[in-house]
C-alpha cells in the first residue's frame, strides 16, 4: 500500500539497521511488463507473476482472490501482458448486505446445494457460485483472446473457498506471493 510503504521502510531501517528492499521500479524481477504504465502494477501482482513463471507452464493466468480479485496474464515469453481487477467476494457480500435490508451478514462457505431453500442458503450459493462461474468465464475469454490454452493458478485468502466450485481446472497455490518475493530477493540480494 503506497501510503504506508515509506513509513514501514523507515521503521524497518531503524529497527534492523539495514535498508530494506522495496519491490518496485529498478528491482530485478525477470518479468517483462507490457503495460501502459509498468510502474503502476502492484508489487503483489509482480511477485505472483514471478513465482508463476518459475513454478508453472506458460502461458499462465494467476487469479488472486482478496479484497479485490485480480487476474494477471503472463504469455509464453514471460511477458506480463495485462489482466483485470474486479470486486472481491468479501466486498461483494458486504455491498449486498449493506444495500438490502432483508439480507444479513453470512459466513462465506458453500451451501449443500446450488438452489437455496432459504435466504442464507441463497446468499451463500449466489456468492460462491457466481464467483466460480465468473472465473470459469474469464478463463474461457482469456484463452479465446490469446488463441491458446493456459495454465490457471489461484491464490489469495478466498481462493480456497471458490476454486473447488469452478468447472475449469484451477490450481491452488496459497504461497505464490511469498515464493515470488523470495525469488525476487534472491535475484537482487547480491546488490544489497
Task: List where the protein language model places each region.
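Short beta-strand scaffold segments in enzyme catalytic cores
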Residues: 62, 69-74
Amino acid at each position: 500500500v503506497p501510503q504506508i510503504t515509506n513509513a514501514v521502510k523507515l521503521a524497518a531501517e531503524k529497527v534492523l539497521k539495514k535498508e530494506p528492499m522495496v519491490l518496485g521500479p529498478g528491482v530485478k524481477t525477470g518479468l517483462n511488463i507490457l503495460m501502459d504504465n509498468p510502474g503502476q502494477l502492484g508489487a503483489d501482482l509482480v511477485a505472483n507473476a514471478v513465482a508463476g513463471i518459475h513454478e508453472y507452464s506458460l502461458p499462465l493466468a494467476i487469479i488472486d482472490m482478496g479484497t479485490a480479485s485480480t487476474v494477471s496474464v503472463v504469455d509464453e515469453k514471460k511477458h506480463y501482458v495485462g489482466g483485470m481487477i474486479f470486486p472481491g467476494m468479501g466486498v461483494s457480500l458486504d455491498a449486498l448486505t449493506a444495500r438490502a435490508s432483508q439480507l444479513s451478514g453470512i459466513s462465506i462457505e458453500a451451501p449443500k446445494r446450488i438452489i437455496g431453500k432459504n435466504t442464507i442458503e441463497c446468499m451463500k450459493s449466489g456468492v460462491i457460485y457466481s464467483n466460480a462461474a465468473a472465473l470459469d468465464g474469464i478463463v474461457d475469454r482469456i484463452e479465446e483472446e490469446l488463441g491458446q490454452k493456459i495454465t490457471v493458478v489461484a491464490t489469495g485468502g478466498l481462493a480456497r473457498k471458490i476454486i473447488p466450485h469452478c468447472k475449469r481446472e484451477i490450481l491452488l497455490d496459497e504461497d505464490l506471493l511469498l515464493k515470488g518475493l523470495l525469488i525476487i530477493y534472491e535475484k537482487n540480494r547480491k546488490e544489497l
